[in-house]
């Protein structure tokens, strides 16, 4: 009986989501934040604007419930593990 009870407790703990939430980097501060319930996708969105050749692409880091749809000319990468959307600033020469 004790073995059955212990097995049930272990299965319950493994199957339950014990309040775990994903963390994503978010702009403009580029700091890691805990995602609210239902938002488990981190993304990095990038695109060119007027000053793209001299300043590089614009970058937007965030979180969402699903990977956002983007317009042509906008690149997006989505992921679902903690802090999987880091931003590495490019070096100016």
Swiss-Prot record:
S-S bridge residues: 24-42, 48-52, 67-78, 79-84
Keywords from the UniProt entry: Acetylcholine receptor inhibiting toxin, Disulfide bond, Ion channel impairing toxin, Neurotoxin, Postsynaptic neurotoxin, Secreted, Signal, Toxin
GO cellular component, one term: extracellular region
Tissue expression notes: Expressed by the venom gland.
Molecular function per GO: acetylcholine receptor inhibitor activity; ion channel regulator activity; toxin activity
Record's signal peptide: 1-21
Entry protein name: Long neurotoxin LNTX22
């Amino acid at each position: 009986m004790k073995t059955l009870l212990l097995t049930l407790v272990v299965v319950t703990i493994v199957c339950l989501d014990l309040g775990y939430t994903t963390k994503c980097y978010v702009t403009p501060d580029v700091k890691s934040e805990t995602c609210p319930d239902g938002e488990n996708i981190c993304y990095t969105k990038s695109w060119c604007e007027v000053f793209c050749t001299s300043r590089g692409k614009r970058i937007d880091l965030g979180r969402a419930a699903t990977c956002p749809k983007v317009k042509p000319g906008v690149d997006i990468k989505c992921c679902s593990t903690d802090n999987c959307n880091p931003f590495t600033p490019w070096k100016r020469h």
